[in-house]
Amino acid sequence: MPTPCLEQFLHHLEKSHLYLSIDNTKQAKKECLESIKILNSIAKTTPLPEIKVLSQYTLNHYESLDKPRTISDKLEWISSKLTQETFFPPVIQFNENFTSHNELFVDTISPIQDNDNKIFEKLPNKLAKFEYIEISNWDNDITHLKNLYQDILPNCSFVSSFLAIIDANIPIIDTITPQKSSQKYKVSLRFNGALRNVIVDSKFPIMPNSRNLIIKSYSDTELYWPALIEKAYLTIMGNGYNFSGSNMANDAYVLSGWLPQIIKLSNGQLPSNIDDLWRLRTQGKVTMGIGTGTLSKQLSSQLHLVSGHDYVIDNIKDGVITVKNPWLDPKDRVVEIKNFNHFKYLYVNWKPDHKPYQHYFLYQAKPNTYNQPQFTIKCMEETWILLERHLSETSSSPSPHWMDMNVFETEYKIITPSQYKKYLSVETNNRLQLIKLKPGVFTIVISSNKPCRFTLSSFNAMFSKSKYKYDYTETVNGEWNSDINGGNWAMSTYINNPQYDIIAKQTTELIMGMHGQGQINFHLFHSSSDSMGERIQNFDKTKLINYQNYNASYQSSSYRLTPGHYKLVVSEYYRSIGTYQLVLNSSEPITITKIPPFLGLYNISKSFNWDNTNRFKLKFETTGYNSKVKIKIAYFNGESDFELQTSYRPAMRASLFNSQTKQPIQINEQFNDSLYGVFLHEILPSPEEYILLIERFEIGYGRCVVEIGCNNKVILK
């Protein structure tokens, strides 16, 4: 018999695709050759016209096995595996009219493997037992289909979606093959980015009383084929008949592929375009449903509405909505609604007008905008964009899983959220998110709180991975720690922040972005070649290229750099400890080098109190020749380790003498009251003892800290 052989042929072909997706080319070839072997066997005995089409497809597939595959192509097949045991392959298009959903690929005699039914081992009702039902009634009469209802199983969203699809004249029966008595069936559902085949049998949980765990029609009790679609749906949801619910927009998408839109209702107001939506509904271009919020039992009884329940919209006229309850109870089957305060969501599913352009991608939860997946799209006219988070083994996890879509009006990759004008932003814990873009060029940034797989689909325009505006990109990771966290520029410790040398050898356009913890900022200063490797010693506004306010978590700025040297200082307003990341995107190559955080290779410090004096001598000894000494003198009013710009501080100066000869080495006559301290730099030619003379303009009190850094060891005397 050819049918079982074709089922086996398809099984090996699908396995070949799956192995190829995980880069096991050897096994992919083995499976493909096995499918060719089966096909050749069938061709010798059965004159099926489809054999030629299958042969050509399989040979083409074999020839392509050594060609590289994109990650997106691989994920289409990898996403067939929701668990280790399950496999829901994409429907293969052999030619325009022939797919792997054809009944030729279903062995109607051999039963389904027991392993495929594991999720149905437990039932929500102990009285229910699985029984095999032979399905001989394949009636597609809309009258009986409109009378489908839910009973014990809390799947109002599924049943309401089914009813809405019937109202839209979508031939949902065609999702099943074969449409005759069989040991197993294929149901095609749209999930994880593709139309996929789900294999089920007709064993259903039957109750000993008149209650039901499956979808039924109260006007045709022998109509069981809708329950096959329901069983396939429950299979991919992962909990079988222990179903906890979904929403109507999601379910209608899975059943029909129509694009799901969820409109949140507030203050009892329907959207202003509700009449236009209903007009589209009457034209068969959308399906519509509505969902209640949380209602008390008393209020539910008064309103004839169910708490947290989805209804099909049956009619809209003169501000009154007629809804159909998916439950059986005839008295509450159709309800007229004038007050919408108790409804939370409007569900609209749009018939797609265009074939989607799709991209599959893996998501790893990472911080910062520039690390997120980004896609640029050019829309010539209004375009629907659908983001789908894939079903997986962890989809039913109790912890919330949200995803973000941020759309910016630019064609370039985003470094920080403030870099370009934001067009829209959506955050949702729903698995599917639909947005509409106006004509224009946009970059879409996607993020989530958990690792997962996504499919992004565009229904009227192609998109591509976003690229930075300029060709050259540098990324720098750093931190503010206990030694290097100077705070904002109004603090005396500002110069203790991380600092960098930047060199531009030619005129350069530069976009700089920064992400970090806390209120963050960066400042870029003009510098010179002779200060390479030297830290700035004050906040010199005359050399400052940019000024912007501190911002939470991110910062960005754009520059046009002329050839030269620059100093970059990154800071956190409150001197908090944390990490930061810099991204520098430039039109020409630039170099960025971190400046050492200390005065020298060897560092010592000395603290003293002024005690109503105005002079202090500090003796120290160098231990090597040509000692490059850098000295910083800082004043403090108390025990705090920083001063503010508004704090009192005396003007000070410092001079250096040879201790033995008393000859001056460096004399400074000018007093300086810089917030950031007084500095003295000198090269001491020989290892000797020296005197540092520190003076203040007037006698007084307070504390003074002297830091000495040197390329050779220095000893305080």
From Swiss-Prot:
This is Calpain-like protease palB/RIM13. The active site is at 156, 309, 325. Pfam families: Peptidase_C2. Residues 85-352 form the Calpain catalytic domain. Belongs to the peptidase C2 family. PalB/RIM13 subfamily. InterPro entries: Calpain_III_sf (IPR036213), PalB/RIM13_Calpain-like (IPR051297), Papain-like_cys_pep_sf (IPR038765), Peptidase_C2_calpain_cat (IPR001300). The gene is RIM13. Its EC number is 3.4.22.-. SUPFAM superfamilies: Calpain large subunit, middle domain (domain III), Cysteine proteinases. GO terms for biological process: cellular response to pH; chlamydospore formation; filamentous growth; filamentous growth of a population of unicellular organisms; proteolysis; symbiont entry into host. Required for the proteolytic cleavage of the transcription factor RIM101 in response to alkaline ambient pH. One of its GO terms (molecular function) is calcium-dependent cysteine-type endopeptidase activity. The keyword Plastid does not apply. Keywords: Hydrolase, Protease, Thiol protease.
